Amino acid sequence: MMTLLRSFFVLTTFLFLSCNSSNEISKPNIVLFMVDDLGWQDTSVSFWKNETKFNRLYNTPNMEILANMGVKFTNAYATPVCSPSRISLMTGMNAAKHRVTNWTLNPNKKKPAEINHKIFEFPDWNYNGLSTLDSISNTIYATPLPQILKDNGYYTIHAGKAHLGAIGYPSSNPLNIGFDINIAGHAAGAPQSYLGVDNFGNNNSKNKIWAVPGLEKYHGKDIFLTQALSEEVLEKLQKPINSKSPFFLYFSLYNVHAPLMEDNRFVEKYKNIGLKNSEIKYASMVESMDHALGVVLKELENKDVLKNTIVVFMSDNGGLSAVAREGEKHNHNYPLKSGKGSIYEGGIRVPMIVYSPFHKTNIREINHPVIIDDFFPSILEFTKCEESSFVQNIDGQSFVPLLNNETVEKKPLFWHYPNWWGPIGPGIGSYSAVRQGKWKFIYFHDTQIIELYNLEKDISENNNLISVNTSKSQLLANVLTKYLKSVDAQMPYNKITNSIVPWPDEHPLFN
């Protein structure tokens, strides 16, 4: 893998010359490496100004290589839970617009935590997920990203977690949304087991819903799920590589989602430094994830296609912190507050790296805020497919100009979660929020509490400025409300007041 680093500067020089001496270049390959529940500080790559204890704990050498080759995005955001991020990725739409605002699984059902809630009756959101047809109830009708790429000549591979549609609905199978190949993707958002000796959960009839499909040749073997997926990815890549066809690989790992389980290839070092049991499991899963990244990068380099491949690394939400971890809850994403499910930074700010041999810049870090909605137009621009037609109106804005060091207006970023996740903790609940520049405004639906933070000075969100900067608060409340109304965003019904939750700009502080 060190060859990657040694060849990087030679490679970019070669590409600069070749790309400028030809009127037409071949379509770039795209590798989108999506990790599940990986926190902003769960790697040995630091995305903050200071290195933290977590950066020193976890071992992710291949992420380090990718970051040295590419560009770190230090203000990258997803949604607080998984399915909304994945639908935004596939459609370019914000969750408030596509209305898949919570995680999907069972058809025609809200989540258990939403049913018979003591305060709220939650809206009839799109719990059946994505759809390529406009006639299916409680789905978002859209033209998915892989379908557009496939229609433009790309060989499309899905590997790992899908979680795009409820059980029995077409989008639960990635083959129905434009992928040529589906490796182990289905409706569920977590595996029953990561272990081949457990048949990845397929020998547990009680919880069959979580069993990972399609990896039967690894059943009974001493192999971790991530390793099995990596081997399948390498096999499926050979067809487009050998035929010199452009490919889109969406490698969507189940790691590091619970249940926490040891990848025995990586546990010894963490046992030797005295970590407790669940943290040993978690650290081994982080390293397992990184190893999978390295396997793919090495194969691309060995087959001489990395020079024509854009690699994007991202997590689907903030790091797990409310459950399953050792130590005090909600403190595993320091300096960020809280974790998965929360509207605080620990729940939505995620690690992101982009390597593109086609964008010649000396910058190694981009601080411009971006969000998962932006991936759809960015990948279309990367692949010269931005003129393609699609049925949805998108919210995303391409981040490709940032890689060319161009000045881009800092648009507001929006989050909307008119739902209930289940676990209790800071910032976990039903809420809406906006970030504009350095300012972040949060509106909690149940308590009607509003908060304002200057993220440049207070990344940990400890100093609520709502009472000292009412004008900025009102401005952001207006921006948030205008957007929510423009997309006809759903709001919960308050059973105590017998009314729909008011819009943010209707808060008593502003009236």
Regions found by a protein language model. Name each.
Residues 54-60, 74-81, 107, 113, ...:
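A short beta-strand-to-alpha-helix junction
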Residues 23-28, 35, 40, 72, ...:
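Long, internal low-complexity/basic segments
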Residues 32-33, 40-143, 148, 202-203, ...:
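Active-site segment of extracytoplasmic enzymes that catalyze sulfate/phosphate-ester chemistry
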Residues 105-155, 162-245, 253-262, 283:
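Formylglycine-dependent
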Residues 181, 319-345, 360-364, 368, ...:
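C-terminal cap/loop subdomain of S1 sulfatases and analogous C-terminal strand-loop tails that border
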Residues 30, 36, 161, 233, ...:
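A short aromatic-rich beta-strand->coil structural motif
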